[in-house]
């Protein structure tokens, strides 16, 4: 499986761009600020429904616009091409289409184009705050757990409503206003919060259990003989790991922390506070592991995710190496390059073409050239949103819109 063509419309810095990829290694090179990362991030969003760079969809949309569109032609091993389209909205639900068909939710196409991204921020999976690790859990579970994104979206909506009621209770208490109606509403939303939270927690627990063994094995292979690593789940609803039916215990927990929640106006427990533990020799790695050990753990974690997604979905994920080579020493650079050579498709971004060792068969894309207005404007190109009227991306009146390294971009 590989992406043969990617088209973006009002996505971050790109007003309009169409770029061709090939099976194997694709190297996107160019100075920082040209939009290399935005191109491969769009693949990540189409694949997982989210970006590791932001928890909000608003930054994904070009300034001054209300919608960003991502389209990709994806060729399977049998040579069949399918067009996937995602529409990212500043307001309202994000939508998707397959082969210009009926409108779907974005979550309905997650996993159709599996990908695993390696980024400069990966070290934060070990050293950073829990938010980075939750983002990875969400992206992994979106690929591996059917219905996960729908459950996550439902939980997020419930959590926001419950937090609003907690703030209202605090305000009513301070102003001497009645609280009975708000308390009744809080009880209802707390029940829904627990129900959705337990489902979410169990899904995440399953994903972490899948990753734990290959993570340890891959780390040992990368690092050689030495300390052992472990990966465990640290749910806020730890009752889920202790009881078959944890609802009563979680409800009691909420009763104990009720005063604190009202005082602060936030949900003090729940999946929004989950974490995962990465330990080296039985000690939290973030507390004492070296920079090199943290990078090796991060690489092992992403490689383990690749392995599990490949084995469970029966598809070879697209590998994204986004500006990682400057962060790695020679040994780890060689390890990740050896891993990349074995994959169906790899998208590599670098600041300079020489930053990555030579691949004889690599398809090289000069991002600076992509950013330049085309010398010839095809009269039938129009807005990229019109592409769905054609049989596939890149077909305009029977002509190919762009060749392997060219692009059409309209700069506003």
From Swiss-Prot:
Record-listed ATP binding positions: 30-37
Localization, UniProt: Cytoplasm
GO biological process, one term: DNA replication
Single annotated GO MF: single-stranded DNA binding
Annotated family: Belongs to the RecF family.
HAMAP family: RecF
Name recorded for this polypeptide: DNA replication and repair protein RecF
Organism: Bifidobacterium longum subsp. infantis (strain ATCC 15697 / DSM 20088 / JCM 1222 / NCTC 11817 / S12)
């Amino acid at each position: 499986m590989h992406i043969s063509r990617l088209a973006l419309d009002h996505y971050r810095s790109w007003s309009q761009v169409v770029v061709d990829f090939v099976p194997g290694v694709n190297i996107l090179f160019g100075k920082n600020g040209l939009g290399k990362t935005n191109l491969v991030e769009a693949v990540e969003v189409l694949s997982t429904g989210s970006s590791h760079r932001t928890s909000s969809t608003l930054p994904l949309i070009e300034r001054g616009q209300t919608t960003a569109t991502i389209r990709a032609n994806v060729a399977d091993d049998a040579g069949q091409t399918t067009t996937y389209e995602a529409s990212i909205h500043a307001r309202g639900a994000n939508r998707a289409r397959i082969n210009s068909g009926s409108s779907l939710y974005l979550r309905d196409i997650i996993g159709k184009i599996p990908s695993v991204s390696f980024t400069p921020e990966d070290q934060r999976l070990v050293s950073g705050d829990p938010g980075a690790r939750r983002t990875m859990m969400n992206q992994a579970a979106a690929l591996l757990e059917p219905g996960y994104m729908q459950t996550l979206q439902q939980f997020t909506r419930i959590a926001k409503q419950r937090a609003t009621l907690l703030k209202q209770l605090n305000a009513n208490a301070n102003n001497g206003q009645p609280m009975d109606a708000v308390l009744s509403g809080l009880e209802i939303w707390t029940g829904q919060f627990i129900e959705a939270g337990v489902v979410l927690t169990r899904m995440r627990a399953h994903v972490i259990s899948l990753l734990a063994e290959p993570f340890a094995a891959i780390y040992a292979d990368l690092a050689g003989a030495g300390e052992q690593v472990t990966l465990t789940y640290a749910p806020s609803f730890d009752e889920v790991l202790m009881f078959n039916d944890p609802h009563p215990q979680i409800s009691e927990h909420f009763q104990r922390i009720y005063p604190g929640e009202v005082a602060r106006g936030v949900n003090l427990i729940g999946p929004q506070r989950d974490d995962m533990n990465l330990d080296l020799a039985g000690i939290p790695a973030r507390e004492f592991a070296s920079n090199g050990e943290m990078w090796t753990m991060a690489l092992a974690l992403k490689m383990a995710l690749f392995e599990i997604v490949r084995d469970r979905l029966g598809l070879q994920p697209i590998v994204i190496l986004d500006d990682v080579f400057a962060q790695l020493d020679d040994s780890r650079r060689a390890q990740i390059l050896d891993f990349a050579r074995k994959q169906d498709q790899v998208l590599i971004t670098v600041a300079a073409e020489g930053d990555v060792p030579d691949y004889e068969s690599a398809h090289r894309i000069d991002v600076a050239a992509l950013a330049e207005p085309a010398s010839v404007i095809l009269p039938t190109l129009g807005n990229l949103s019109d592409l769905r009227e054609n049989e596939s991306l890149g077909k305009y009146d029977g002509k190919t819109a762009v060749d392997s390294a060219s692009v059409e971009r309209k700069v506003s």
